[in-house]
Amino acid sequence: MTNVILLVLIAVAIFVAAAFLYVSRIISIPPQGRAVDYLNSKLKNNQRVIACIGDSLTHGNIGQSWIDYLRKGFPNDVFLNEGINGNTVWQVIQRVDPILACKPDIVILMIGSNDAMGSFNEKSGLRYKRNNNLPEAPSFDKYKEQLTDLLDRLG
């Protein structure tokens, strides 16, 4: 009986490890249809470019993204998925130049959930700073300042 329990525990551990590795790999893959892809492609002149910028809420979850639904609903438009899991507004500012080079007609901005998570307390702020290579821990005041800077750049 003990051997059976041990084998079941080993099988469960292997399954959990494999599932974790699978999900980790999927969420680390950048979304399809990024600004770099657009800049390297030949598109029709009459297509509107819609830049969707943000964090994991923009990037989408495993295999699905609200941007994919927009692409299906508006097939004559180009939707850039510039959602990167875990990003803060500071990180979006650091990568906005290729997006601006696409000269988007419309920008959909969804950013701030990771800034909020990093602003809860000092421990979470330091964790976000370390894990995301931020110059400083997220804070509500920094978010307002950086969001204003980002909106100025996008405007």
Task: Say what each PLM segment does.
Residues 72, 91-155:
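Alpha-helical cap/lid subdomain in secreted, periplasmic
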Residues 63-64, 120:
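Conserved catalytic-core motifs of eukaryotic protein kinase domains, centered on the activation segment
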Residues 58-59, 80, 114-117:
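Nucleotide phosphate-binding site architecture
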Residues 59-63, 85, 89, 140-144:
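Solvent-exposed, acidic/flexible segments
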Residues 1-53, 58-62, 68-73, 77, ...:
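N-terminal secretory targeting modules
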Residues 53-55, 82-85, 110-113:
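Active-site-proximal beta-strand/loop segments in catalytic clefts of secreted hydrolases
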Residues 35-36, 63, 92, 147:
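Amphipathic coiled-coil/heptad-repeat helices and related helical stalk/stem segments
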Residues 76-90:
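A short beta-strand-loop structural module common to alpha/beta enzyme folds
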